[in-house]
From Swiss-Prot:
Protein's gene: dusC
Name by which UniProt lists this protein: tRNA-dihydrouridine(16) synthase
CDD domains: DUS_like_FMN (cd02801)
Pfam families: Dus
Presence of the UniProt keyword Lipoprotein in the record: no
Domain of life: Bacteria
Keyword Transcription regulation tagged: no
Transmembrane regions: none
Gene Ontology molecular function: any one: flavin adenine dinucleotide binding
Taxonomy of the source species: Bacteria, Pseudomonadati, Pseudomonadota, Gammaproteobacteria, Enterobacterales
Length: 316
């Protein structure tokens, strides 16, 4: 089976990819989206979102990374897709699933689900702009406010020449509500298409991954939020390994505070450590206590000192 690390805007950036791929066995990471409007973006934009481009499109530990584009105009998606692969990206991905109001308001992400023809035109333009030996993938949801167009959406992706399709098993309107996950619908799409379909949504552990694959028939999954809840989730999902012990999680957080974010204004670690702890609290009781301690801290040095002060030896 393949396990992919999902793109999560404002969460899974290059530093977190570096940390997570060191302790996991991901087959591929997809970047946060590069927003494409009406121009060919400068090289520095791609390098900011995906610094791994300067390392043969791999994280420091060797996991492949693919640049994701978000936009609606085929010409500019094509030109920026070509630039991404020229810079070294291992293929490109088209975002047709992001539910963010800001993104949808500008005509990108899940908005494309309303009109599968836009998905077809965007993916086709990207496919034609990218050398045939490199993959072009598309990430979608089941629809905007219903699943009525799910087959039309899937057909558009395949007919555009995409290499593979990632399906999040909910509509845009359903957001991330657990009760709405529909792995069966993903399976219906998989049966319809000839290209590989990757299942996404509500995969939190080995059992849920097995259930998802059994219901959908997919042999590959993409995980997002769960990868932050359990930092070694790909190994849990692939090999039924136990979740990472809390002392190892703390060591990961300590390393995170030592990594420098390029062009950081001094608030990067403040926001991101608190954000990560809020995910960890769902799996580790110890994270709640640590979160209560750091949530009142408002600058990176204080956050770093608080995390670094934890004696891992006493946790074992």
């Amino acid at each position: 089976m393949r396990v992919l690390l999902a793109p999560m805007e404002g969460v899974l950036d290059s530093l977190v990819r570096e940390l997570l791929t060191e302790v996991n066995d991901y087959d591929l990471c997809i970047t946060e989206f590069v927003r494409v409007v009406d121009q060919l973006l400068p090289v520095k934009v791609f390098h900011r979102i995906c610094p791994e481009l300067q390392n043969a499109s791999r994280t420091p530990s060797g996991t492949l990374v693919r640049v994701q584009l978000l936009g609606q105009f085929p010409q500019w998606l094509a030109e920026n897709a070509a630039r991404a692969v020229e810079l070294g990206s291992w293929g490109v991905d088209l975002n047709c699933g992001c539910p963010s109001k800001t993104v949808n308001g500008s005509g990108g992400g899940a908005t494309l689900l309303k009109d599968p023809e836009l998905i077809y035109q965007g993916a086709k333009a990207m496919r034609e702009a990218v050398p045939a030996h490199l993959p072009v993938s598309v990430k979608v949801r089941l629809g905007w406010d219903s699943g009525e167009k799910k087959f039309e959406i899937a057909d558009a992706v395949q007919q555009a020449g995409a290499t593979e399709l990632v399906v999040h098993g909910r509509t845009k309107e359903q957001g991330y509500r657990a009760e709405h996950i529909d792995w069966q619908a993903i399976g219906e799409i998989r049966q319809r298409l000839n290209i590989p379909v990757i299942a996404n949504g509500e995969i939190w552990d080995w059992q849920s991954a097995q259930e998802c694959m059994a219901i959908s028939g997919c042999d590959s999954v993409m995980i997002g939020r769960g990868a932050l809840n359990i930092p070694n989730l790909s190994r849990v999902v692939k090999y039924n390994e136990p979740r990472m012990p809390w002392p190892e999680v703390v060591a990961l957080l300590q390393k995170y505070t030592r990594l420098e974010k390029q062009s950081d204004t001094g608030l990067y670690h403040v926001a991101r450590i608190k954000q990560w702890l809020s995910y960890l609290r769902k799996e580790y009781d110890e994270a709640t206590e640590l979160f209560q301690h750091v949530r009142v801290l408002n600058n990176s040095p204080d956050i770093a000192r608080a995390i670094q002060a934890i004696d891992i030896g006493k946790l074992r």
